[in-house]
Amino acid sequence: MANDKDIAAVGSILVNTKQDLTTRFRALFTLRNLGGAEAVKWISEAFVDESALLKHELAYCLGQMQDESAIPTLEAVLKDTNQEPMVRHEAGEALGAIGNPKVLELLKKYAEDPVIEVAETCQLAVKRLEWLMNGGEQTKDGTDENPYCSVDPAPPAQRKSVPELRTQLLDETLPLFDRYRAMFALRNLGTEEAVLALGDGLQCSSALFRHEIGYVLGQIQHEASIPQLQAALEKMDENAMVRHECAEALGSIGKEPCVQILERYRKDQERVVKESCEVALDMLEYENSSQFQYADGLLRLQSAH
């Protein structure tokens, strides 16, 4: 069991701007896995960083940890219009993931935010909290289990055929929450047919929606999605939030063609895309080596003594 001293040692790597971004990401994931108020405190301290990629990942981790001590930090990040939209969006999503209804009024306020990605995120988070408050987690009628350890912005839709779920996914007249439910139902199926249906979502009009498609394709890690992920990454006029998520998904799939694509974009002019490629390649290097675990902040500290 890690003590506060161990956590502080890993935390000091996370907040050290002189460290490589890849090393700091490893420290972040170590803190997420360790959990607890002290880990939350260290993660919260890194929101002053210049890297939007790192800050958005901080918010994501705080949401996944579901520790209510992170709520004040996440509220402050959501309110801070100097933070990049992708960071504010992730803070809003994390508040929904933690699931405490006390943030409902704040989320309703920011559901009207002038930044569309932030507004749509908060609309989804409001719907998720209302779903939780109505006992949604207790009633799992006809839905498939989430095979991943993620807290999602929407529950899966009830089990239907892939063509039916695809229709729900792509129907832009439906509320975003309902389309997200179809997205997570398709993800939970994880078949090639489901993956190809999800890939079609990369053509939809909402950048937030497209970036979430990239995220779930990264979770599934199915090679059938490589061409669509590559096409989105190569689209230079695509929203950087979408391109970065597609880069991370390619890294998650990790096949040789993915490595070649990531190598090509590790010098991209968009900082968040460039950094995503660097982090993804670092994760792949770990997976292809004999290193025991990616979130190895504590192991690295021990080997340095």
UniProtKB/Swiss-Prot annotation:
GO MF: deoxyhypusine monooxygenase activity; iron ion binding
Pathway: Protein modification; eIF5A hypusination
InterPro entries xref list: ARM-like, ARM-type_fold, Deoxyhypusine_hydroxylase, PBS_lyase_HEAT
EC number(s) from the headed UniProt entry: 1.14.99.29
List of residues binding Fe cation 1: 56, 244-245
Segments of this protein annotated with the region Disordered: 137-160
Root EC class: oxidoreductase
Keyword terms of this UniProt record: Hypusine biosynthesis, Iron, Metal-binding, Monooxygenase, Oxidoreductase, Repeat
GO biological process: peptidyl-lysine modification to peptidyl-hypusine
Entry keyword annotation includes Oxidoreductase: yes
Catalytic reaction list: [eIF5A protein]-deoxyhypusine + AH2 + O2 = [eIF5A protein]-hypusine + A + H2O
Annotated HEAT-like PBS-type repeat ranges: 54-80, 87-113, 178-204, 209-235, 242-268
Chain positions recorded as Fe cation 2 binding sites: 89-90, 211
Cofactor requirements of the protein: Fe(2+)
Descriptive protein name: Deoxyhypusine hydroxylase
Cofactor descriptive note: Binds 2 Fe(2+) ions per subunit.
The organism of origin for this protein: Danio rerio (Zebrafish)
Entry function: Catalyzes the hydroxylation of the N(6)-(4-aminobutyl)-L-lysine intermediate produced by deoxyhypusine synthase/DHPS on a critical lysine of the eukaryotic translation initiation factor 5A/eIF-5A. This is the second step of the post-translational modification of that lysine into an unusual amino acid residue named hypusine. Hypusination is unique to mature eIF-5A factor and is essential for its function.
Protein family per UniProt: Belongs to the deoxyhypusine hydroxylase family.
